[in-house]
């Protein structure tokens, strides 16, 4: 059995296109574009000059537009100038009105001040009359009420004096105690400065502390001995129990 032949013939595309011949194109070719009719230099100059001059209709239109624009500018300027003048006049009028109103307000304020001062004087007169009436009523009170008031006042004064005296005495006592404490703290406790009674008290305290220490040591020794004796008994009991079987 032989292998199948899968070879394909190679075809050159350029050669195939040449064999077909020229394509019939519908339209101008490149050669037609290159061979087009061209104007001479003189004709070009004439066209440029015409462009520079421009058309007469366009020139007339531009002139009319410029004239209209100038007229509008003049109108606008006139309006602005008239508006500025009117605004300046309005400002002057407002200033005059303010001055007039200020004068009227000053006169009204002066009148109001005078009225307020008169009302204040009336209020003061009323207050003075009320005070006089109160004083008269106090003077006309019964002498008994005045005596009771004076007695209560004297009692209150005596109580306050006693309290102040007690407070001052307490403060003095506290100050004296604090001074004594500071003196004792500052002075060193030497054998020469201490008195005989102080020495006796110190010795007694030392003896008591020594006796207490001895007692505590004796108790500790007894406890230790008791512990040792109990341990020995336990050991003997354990050894006897082990020997018996």
Swiss-Prot record:
The family this protein is said to belong to: Belongs to the FAM133 family.
Phosphoserine: residues bearing it: 82, 190-191, 193, 195
Bias-annotated ranges (Basic and acidic residues): 69-80, 165-176, 209-219
Basic residues: bias regions: 89-102, 128-140, 220-237
Keywords from the UniProt entry: Phosphoprotein
Organism domain of life: Eukaryota
Region (Disordered): 19-38, 69-245
InterPro entries, alphabetized: Fam133
Biased composition (Low complexity): 103-119
Entry protein name: Protein FAM133B
Source organism per UniProt: Mus musculus
Keyword Oxidoreductase recorded: no
